[in-house]
Amino acid sequence: MPVHPTASPTLSGTPVVALDGVGKTFANGMVALERLDLAVHAGEFVSLLGPSGCGKSTALRIIAGLSAPSRGRVAWADGGAADARTVGAHRIGFVFQEPTLMPWATVAANVRLPLRLAGLKADASARIDAALARVGLAGFAQSYPRELSGGMKMRASIARALVTEPALLLMDEPFAALDEITRFRLNNDLLALWQSLRKTVVFVTHSVFESVYLSQRIVVMTPRPGRVFTELTIDAPFPRDESFRTSADYAGYCRLVSDALAAAIGAGEGS
């Protein structure tokens, strides 16, 4: 298969969510984002890739309604607008950089939290059991976070994000602090979940290698103030496994994405 990026993949239908000219200026005057345009379609696995501080996490928080844009708009397929009070209406799950588990609560109680906040009491226990089974923690419902490894804590965090059966899963560098073996294992588990559940995923990462392995589409961002520099399609079939990671296609895509990232950084420094 020839390795080639496309500048903008052709996707049909109304996006699940679209950022139109979004800008974000913080109270201290720092401009994190400027003229950010991004459309995410149903069932996509999209990664946001860029240098530290380019606004990737800020963009994710704006999509989730945890931060309001200073300029531009966030448009949803249902015509609504997200904020911290209405995220549930858009069925969003959010996985943060750290597991952020309540240390005094069991794994099951941590996973139950989004159900409580959304007022979803019916079949709560069954939902929790199903979410834990999906991430390989079926036998750890009554364990406490202190009893889990770093990878298991992140699995619990993913289960918590999945328990409300969100249509859109937002993930902010969830595996960055893990060792490479655990990270690769969780990459595979995440892809298996995505393929079986057909969620829409927006994934933030600093890693070229991780973005190529996971994504259908990679959005490369400029340094702060962040905007889209280019988009690349990874035209490799799923499921992906170790054979893809050791293939010439994978190496070629990594070079292309690395070159695009270097060009984005250069463009930002020259602006």
Can you name each region flagged by the protein language model?
Residues 116, 122-140, 192:
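Conserved ABC ATPase "signature" region
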Residues 169-172:
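Catalytic Walker B motif of ABC-type/P-loop ATPase nucleotide-binding domains
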Residues 49-51:
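The feature captures the beta-strand-to-loop junction immediately N-terminal to the Walker
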Residues 64:
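Helix-to-loop junction immediately C-terminal to a conserved catalytic motif
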Residues 143-146, 164:
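Conserved signature/switch motifs of ABC ATPase nucleotide-binding domains
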Residues 72-88:
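Conserved ABC transporter NBD signature motif
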Residues 105-112:
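Short coil-to-helix segment of the ABC ATPase nucleotide-binding domain corresponding to the Q-loop/switch region
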